[in-house]
Amino acid sequence: EFPWYDIEISGKGNFEDCRFPPCHSAWDKYDQIVDLADKYGLETIARLSSTPEWARTKVTGTFAPPDNYSDFADYAVAVVERYRGRVRYFQIWNEPNGNAEWGDQPVDPEGYTRLLCETYTRLKAVDPDIVVLAAALTPTNEVTGDNLNEFVYLQRMYDAGAAECFDIMSVQGYGLWSGPTDHRLNPITVNYSRHVYLRDIMVRNGDEHKAIWISEMNWNAVPPDSGLPPNYGQATLKQQARWAPLAYERAQKEWPWIGVINFWFFKRADDSEKNRTWYYFRMAEPDFTLMPVYEAMKAYIAAHPYSKAP
């Protein structure tokens, strides 16, 4: 993520970070990320989201949408201009169909579509060669308004004109309680196959030519004796190590519309979040102690030649 609140911190057009004197460029961290990606031949997907305090007076929290979508588009343009020719892929927001990532207020598919379309138009004017990903939608069966089922949300995006405003669709690929070979298709079942319903909606709206990328994929290996609730399903470390490679294998064999699958995540900076269930998606501990899933994915990658994203 290239979070807005960490780049344009204290006011519009101010890219200085003075939170911890002496002041320095807020771009420094992200310049280093892009430099390292270049050095090691890696592609970067820059997720653009997380509103700074000065840009959100109506709703609190960094995940709230901005008061003015044009401010967000200006920040996105600044990122694209700075890394033109070096970063090609940009994801606009994350999980806007869940109120936790929309300012803890009722979600707004039409509002998100306006944000997406304004940003898409501005970015393509700067660099028509970039690739814009729509936000990954979180799987949910709720239709309360606070959280909105991703199938309903995506159709409302299309109804609001989103088809012209993204190049690739993003989804979340969590299996929760079942493995990657779970072929059940039930609109109220959250499993690794669930995105097929979103694919059907895309086809129905004339977007069969667009790829789907999985923004986050993994199984949660929270220890049974941790006392933590299995909010994201539960797998053993051995199951996690077996299932992650199978997730890539199944997508390659069965779903030609799937492109990139992002494993979430490698490691945290420290162990201060070990009391949070989501910590146990990790591939490595903060001290770089490797989990079995790391070795499993390393072996799988070694056996499957790398192919560059389109």
Language-model-detected regions and their locations in the chain:
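Substrate-binding cleft and catalytic face of glycoside hydrolase catalytic domains
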Residues: 1-146, 176, 219-224, 267-269, ...
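Aromatic-rich peripheral "rim/lid" segments of glycoside hydrolase catalytic domains that contact
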Residues: 12-17, 21, 82, 91, ...
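Non-transmembrane alpha-helical segments in soluble domains
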Residues: 34, 76-80, 120, 124, ...
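Noncatalytic carbohydrate-binding groove/subsite architecture in carbohydrate-active enzymes
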Residues: 69, 73, 107-238, 272, ...
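Structural motif
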Residues: 81-88, 160-161, 204-205, 252-256
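Core-facing hydrophobic residues within beta-strands of well-ordered domains
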Residues: 86-87, 166, 209, 258
